[in-house]
C-alpha cells in the first residue's frame, strides 16, 4: 500500500514523466528516420523503450485515477455497510 500512497502524492509528476517519455520516443524515432544512412540500432531501442515505458506509466496513472474514484477502500467499505444488515455482517 505504500506504493499507492507514493503514487497518490506524486501523481502529476509521474503523469508528466510518462508524457515526457512519449515525447522522447517521438524525437528518437524522428532522429532515426531522418538519417540518410541506414538506421542504427541504438535509436530504435531508445525509441521503443521510451514508448513502452511512457505508455505503461500513462495508462497506469489513468487506471490509478479510476481506482481512486471508484474502488478506494473507504468507498468500498461504505458500500458494504450500507448494503448489508448487522446480522449478515457477523
From Swiss-Prot:
Changing residue 71 to S: Loss of dimerization; loss of viral yield. Phosphorylated by viral OPG054 kinase, phosphorylation state is regulated by OPG106 phosphatase. Keywords: Disulfide bond, Membrane, Phosphoprotein, Transmembrane, Transmembrane helix, Viral envelope protein, Virion. InterPro entries: Poxvirus_A14. Changing residue 88 to A: No effect on phosphorylation. Changing residue 36 to A: No effect on phosphorylation. Changing residue 25 to A: No effect on phosphorylation. Residues 1-10, 66-90 are intravirion. It is found in: Virion membrane. The chain crosses the membrane at residues 11-31, 45-65. Changing residue 65 to A: No effect on phosphorylation. GO terms for cellular component: membrane; viral envelope; virion membrane. The keyword Disulfide bond applies. Pfam families: Pox_A14. Residues 32-44 are virion surface. Its main location: virion. It is a multi-pass membrane protein. Belongs to the orthopoxvirus OPG140 family. Envelope protein which is a major component of the mature virion (MV) membrane. Essential for membrane biogenesis. Is required, together with OPG144, to form bona fide crescents, which can progress to form the immature virion (IV) membrane. OPG140 and OPG144 form a lattice that is stabilized by disulfide bonds and serves as an anchor within the viral membrane to which several other proteins important in virion structure and morphogenesis attach. Homodimer; disulfide-linked. Interacts with OPG144. This is Virion membrane protein OPG140. It comes from Vaccinia virus (strain Western Reserve) (VACV).
Amino acid at each position: 500500500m505504500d506504493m499507492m500512497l507514493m503514487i497518490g502524492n506524486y501523481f502529476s509528476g509521474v503523469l508528466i514523466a510518462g508524457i515526457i517519455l512519449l515525447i522522447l520516443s517521438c524525437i528518437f524515432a524522428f532522429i532515426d528516420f531522418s538519417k540518410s544512412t541506414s538506421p542504427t540500432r541504438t535509436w530504435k531501442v531508445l525509441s521503443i523503450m521510451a514508448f513502452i515505458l511512457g505508455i505503461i506509466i500513462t495508462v497506469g496513472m489513468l487506471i490509478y485515477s479510476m481506482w481512486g474514484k471508484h474502488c478506494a477502500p473507504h468507498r468500498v467499505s461504505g458500500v458494504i455497510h450500507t448494503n448489508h444488515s448487522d446480522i449478515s455482517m457477523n
